């Protein structure tokens, strides 16, 4: 059986300097031939291509890890934030500029990462979600966290004999509450990283875990469960009640004694999992183990990191939650495609039902059945969200201004609504802060940018400068555009 952790990796490096990497990677999965003619953009797609089945049950390994390592909650991570993002006037990074393709839509809100995260070549930000996805009242306890995902680029050029960047650390999350200022620093917002891991039992029968080598181009949070896009396979699922703490005494220089009498170490950057009776985490205090997965039922139709085909399973490039109908939540999933002459497909977007009682995907007879699917009107889509029937799409153009597009279902087809909205350079996943918990509350469309600021010619253009930020547009501002 092909399980998620056995599958070949697929990462989509889309920066001009990196190229459209892996564009011809041959994958060890069944591949369907590319049709001679492209599907018509906006037409209904075969919805069953998005159907999913549950993967292996990892709960026993997670339970065993929780008997060895203490758990913490999301609010604890926020309280233990050891990095500070800046907002308002203190956030000076500007990936919007004046815009290459017309008047840029300036964000209503913007947060800048700390200097290390803003400039790192190792970690690339991709996915975003938040408590407005997770909870109808838009609160986690008393907090309003955002969560973002970064993948480890694992660039061999960064790897030296004494460098901790040699191992591929997989995917990390950042937990940040944009509404809670740092005491004494009104423009500061604390945040904390946590490493995603896959649990397993080692050859001695002991519970351990390993890094998860995926792109994590989209994440979505519903109730306790965090969904992470696994490009060629489907979805990985994590439980926010299972965040493990490897340094509860907050003294990194001394190994902690674990609940089962062993040790945990947060100083060795090269190691992960249980090794010689010590638990490691590539120096991260917190790790979040995978609890479940969903795998595409259809054979994977894609054999390229960049291009797409019209049939077979899609790529899970990005995901989001549609909470328009409070009792019928939906997970939106779509593809990134860089069309060319031989591969003209623009990509597909589908909708999968969520069981509002459990927070997991809704199954019938062991299958998650897609409720709708369409071919995308345009390619180069990095993120998609849907609310009250309106689709929102982030599109990227290397180190040029990105664009925000809208679309609706009209006469049975997914068609453009209004004109292009010039956006930030390198826009990624999308998340809607729906504001349903308070009548008249401002609704926001959140996203983040992936390209770090550097001195290359394309990144210093005043029309489209590079830089990493979290940002939000008011939905009302977007809908007011022609």
Where are these regions (language model features)?
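Sequence/structural signature of beta-propeller modules
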Residues: 2-4, 17-118, 463-482
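Residue-level signature of beta-propeller blades and closely related beta-rich strand-turn architectures
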Residues: 134, 151-152, 232, 241, ...
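Short loop/turn segments immediately following beta-strands, especially the blade-tip
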Residues: 176-186, 239-277, 325, 339-365, ...
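Loop/turn-rich, solvent-exposed surfaces of beta-rich toroidal or solenoidal domains
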Residues: 144, 320-323, 327-438
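Structural signature of eukaryotic scaffold interfaces centered on beta-propeller domains
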Residues: 119-143, 211-222, 308-330, 377, ...
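Surface-exposed loop and turn segments in beta-propeller and other repeat-based domains
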Residues: 69-121, 180-210, 251-312, 361-377, ...
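Blade-loop segments of beta-propeller domains
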Residues: 113-138, 148-217
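Structural motif
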Residues: 155-177, 234-242, 330, 339-355, ...
């Amino acid at each position: 059986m092909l399980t998620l952790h056995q599958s070949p990796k697929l990462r989509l490096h889309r920066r001009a300097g990196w190229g459209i990497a892996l564009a011809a990677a041959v994958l060890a999965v069944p591949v369907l031939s590319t049709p001679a003619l492209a599907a018509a953009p906006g037409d209904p797609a075969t919805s069953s291509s998005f159907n999913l089945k549950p993967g292996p049950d990892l709960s026993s390994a997670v339970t065993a890890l929780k008997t060895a390592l203490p758990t913490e909650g999301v609010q604890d991570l926020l309280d233990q934030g050891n990095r500070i993002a800046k907002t308002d006037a203190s956030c000076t990074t500007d990936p919007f500029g004046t815009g290459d393709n017309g008047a840029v839509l300036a964000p209503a809100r913007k947060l800048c990462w700390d200097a290390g995260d803003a400039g790192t070549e190792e970690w690339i930000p991709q996915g975003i979600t938040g408590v407005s996805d997770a909870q109808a009242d838009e609160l986690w306890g008393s907090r309003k966290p955002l969560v973002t995902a970064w993948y480890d680029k694992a660039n061999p050029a960064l790897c030296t004999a004494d460098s901790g960047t040699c191992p591929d650390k997989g995917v990390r999350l950042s937990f940040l509450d944009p509404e809670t200022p740092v005491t004494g620093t009104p423009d500061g917002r604390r945040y904390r990283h946590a490493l995603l891991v896959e649990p397993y039992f080692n050859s001695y029968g002991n519970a351990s875990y390993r890094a998860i080598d995926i792109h994590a181009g989209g994440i979505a949070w519903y109730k306790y469960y965090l969904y992470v896009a696994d490009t060629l396979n489907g979805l990985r699922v994590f439980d926010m009640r299972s965040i493990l703490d490897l340094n509860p005494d907050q003294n990194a220089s001394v190994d902690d004694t674990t609940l089962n009498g062993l040790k945990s170490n947060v100083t060795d950057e090269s190691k992960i999992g249980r090794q010689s009776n010590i638990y490691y985490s590539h120096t991260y205090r917190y790790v979040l183990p995978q609890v479940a997965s969903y795998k595409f039922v259809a054979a994977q139709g894609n054999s390229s990191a960049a291009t797409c085909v019209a049939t077979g399973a899609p790529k899970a490039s990005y995901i989001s939650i549609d909470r328009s109908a409070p009792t019928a939540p939906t997970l939106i999933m779509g593809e990134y495609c860089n069309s060319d002459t031989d591969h003209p497909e623009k990509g597909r977007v589908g909708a999968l039902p969520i069981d509002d009682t459990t927070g997991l995907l809704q199954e019938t007879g062991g299958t998650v059945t897609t409720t709708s699917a369409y071919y995308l009107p345009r390619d180069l889509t990095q993120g998609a969200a849907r609310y009250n029937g309106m689709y929102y799409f982030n599109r990227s153009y290397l180190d040029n201004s990105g664009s925000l597009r809208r679309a609706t279902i009209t006469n049975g087809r997914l068609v453009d609504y209004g004109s292009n909205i010039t956006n930030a350079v390198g826009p990624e996943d999308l998340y809607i802060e729906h504001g349903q918990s308070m009548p008249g509350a401002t609704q926001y469309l959140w996203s983040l940018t992936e390209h770090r600021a550097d001195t290359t010619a394309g990144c210093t253009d005043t029309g489209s400068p590079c830089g990493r930020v979290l940002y939000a547009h008011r939905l009302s501002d977007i809908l007011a555009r022609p």
